[in-house]
Amino acid sequence: MFELKTVALFVVTAIAEIVGCYLPYLWLRQSGSIWLLLPAALSLALFAWLLSLHPEASGRVYAAYGGIYVAVALGWLWLVDGIKPTNWDVAGVVFTFIGMGIIMFAPRA
């Protein structure tokens, strides 16, 4: 159960990070309102706070989180940008999940 909570927290964290970066992109590249920067800053603050909720050392958390981030970013690519991930994209996610699993679940001395 702990692992499922951890992965769910990583997913929410990734969404907060992506939204926090996507909104300034809309402002800078898509002629969005400068007011998009306010929710972007709040989203990035939420992202940082969510990362602090994990009991592991921060470097390990960031490394393991990276695997979930890659998967969520490809989901964003598909759902928001309307671009279907390629088989190579999916293979990349599988490899990042393998690395994430090793980092998260390896025995600790």
Swiss-Prot record:
Keywords from the named record: Cell inner membrane, Cell membrane, Membrane, Transmembrane, Transmembrane helix
Membrane-topology descriptor: Multi-pass membrane protein
Residues that span the membrane, as ranges: 7-27, 33-53, 63-83, 87-107
Pfam families with a match to the protein in the record: UPF0060
Location (main, coarse): membrane
Record-linked HAMAP family: UPF0060
Name the record gives this protein: UPF0060 membrane protein HEAR0108
Organism classification: Bacteria, Pseudomonadati, Pseudomonadota, Betaproteobacteria, Burkholderiales
